[in-house]
Amino acid sequence: MIVKIYPSKISGIIKAPQSKSLAIRLIFLSLFTRVYLHNLVLSEDVIDAIKSVRALGVKVKNNSEFIPPEKLEIKERFIKLKGSATTLRMLIPILAAIGGEVTIDADESLRRRPLNRIVQALSNYGISFSSYSLPLTITGKLSSNEIKISGDESSQYISGLIYALHILNGGSIEILPPISSKSYILLTIDLFKRFGSDVKFYGSKIHVNPNNLVEFQGEVAGDYGLASFYALSALVSGGGITITNLWEPKEYFGDHSIVKIFSEMGASSEYKDGRWFVKAKDKYSPIKIDIDDAPDLAMTIAGLSAIAEGTSEIIGIERLRIKESDRIESIRKILGLYGVGSEVKYNSILIFGINKGMLNSPVTDCLNDHRVAMMSSALALVNGGVITSAECVGKSNPNYWQDLLSLNAKISIE
């Protein structure tokens, strides 16, 4: 797919894309209780999660009703995913808790991602692995409900272990610091608490004391990270939008913090009663910010930094190298094509903002990364641009291009 973007001003009201992080967690919750997801958007990552719970005996009706099995067991000995790292990393400890032998594989983007920390951790508790990357054969059953794991590679392992300990009727996780992307661990804990489980997080230790979980019926709430690209598009193009279907921002730093971050950079950005109100200003200020607890915000912050008056620094970026693309290099490459300079330092990137009227009109490839395409599309709204392999947005938000059209973007899709 090729998307041609012409100078446009973004305006209107848009419903936030469903949170794939929350959708995947709710789908995995169906291992324990009935889950009814209304109007579920079938992004590639969500389809991976559905495929995974089916392999464990969950009955799925119309991709909306999820009924837990009477007994959890591995029904399929080979599980083929596409590209959902969240699904993969949460699934591994769940499989280990159920026990048996199973092989997992996925597309090339997941094959190149390391699984070192979860393999190292679970190898100490009765699990055998065929390698440290996909394709991966897992054999055995967890021999302990007290797990110790390093927290520096991915928080998704920790979230998966919380599910695993519910299978094992409770236990504890000791996380060896540093703890990266802590906000996503808190998201998982908040979800279990909401549905009746007792999960406590003290310092670096999580205690799980399962209770019977209540059923869930409803629509998946909006995703601040994905919604932030609509906000970025409005701010870059000189427009203004209202984004609906969003939960109230939490106190801890996470994807929802983008509302405050954009405000600190000089934008009109405010949350009120489930809506995010965004309006462009004539100029934006640079920012220095650590995104280690919410790395998916890197692209949107980089996008606004590109037209800020000065030098911005995004810190805590090391794990961006093991996303769908090497996002550190992707940011450098895409910004460079638009005429924006950047410099990578140890665990940070400097972005040298320019007047937006000086942005180029390049042809950019999405580099097999949905967030790269979304950042590039926002910058292209100023002076135009072309995005190739634009179907990559389907990984998280298959409606993205149609949503931009509804917000008055002038684009053509080939």
UniProtKB/Swiss-Prot annotation:
Q: Which domain of life is it from?
A: Archaea
Write out the residues that bind phosphoenolpyruvate. 20, 113, 156, 327, 371, 395
Q: Which GO terms describe its cellular component?
A: cytoplasm
UniProt KW Amino-acid biosynthesis keyword: yes
Q: What does this protein do?
A: Catalyzes the transfer of the enolpyruvyl moiety of phosphoenolpyruvate (PEP) to the 5-hydroxyl of shikimate-3-phosphate (S3P) to produce enolpyruvyl shikimate-3-phosphate and inorganic phosphate.
SUPFAM superfamilies given in the database record:
EPT/RTPC-like
On assembly, the entry states: Monomer.
Metabolic or biological pathway, per its Swiss-Prot or TrEMBL entry: Metabolic intermediate biosynthesis; chorismate biosynthesis
User: Catalytic center at which residues?
Assistant: 296 (proton acceptor)
Q: What is its EC number?
A: 2.5.1.19
Q: Which UniProt keywords apply?
A: Amino-acid biosynthesis, Aromatic amino acid biosynthesis, Cytoplasm, Transferase
| Annotated Gene3D superfamilies | Enolpyruvate transferase domain
InterPro entries listed in its UniProt record: Enolpyruvate_Tfrase_dom, Enolpyruvate_Tfrase_sf, EPSP_synthase, EPSP_synthase_CS, RNA3'P_cycl/enolpyr_Trfase_a/b
Give the record's family classification: Belongs to the EPSP synthase family.
Q: What is its main location?
A: cytoplasm
User: What GO biological process terms are annotated to this protein in UniProt?
Assistant: amino acid biosynthetic process; aromatic amino acid family biosynthetic process; chorismate biosynthetic process
Q: What does the entry list as the binding residues for 3-phosphoshikimate?
A: 20-21, 25, 154-156, 181, 296, 323
**Species in which this protein is naturally found:** Saccharolobus solfataricus (strain ATCC 35092 / DSM 1617 / JCM 11322 / P2)
Question: Which reaction(s) does the protein catalyse, per the Swiss-Prot or TrEMBL entry?
Answer: 3-phosphoshikimate + phosphoenolpyruvate = 5-O-(1-carboxyvinyl)-3-phosphoshikimate + phosphate
Write down what this protein is called: 3-phosphoshikimate 1-carboxyvinyltransferase
One MF term in the entry's GO annotations: 3-phosphoshikimate 1-carboxyvinyltransferase activity
Location of this chain's protein in the cell: Cytoplasm
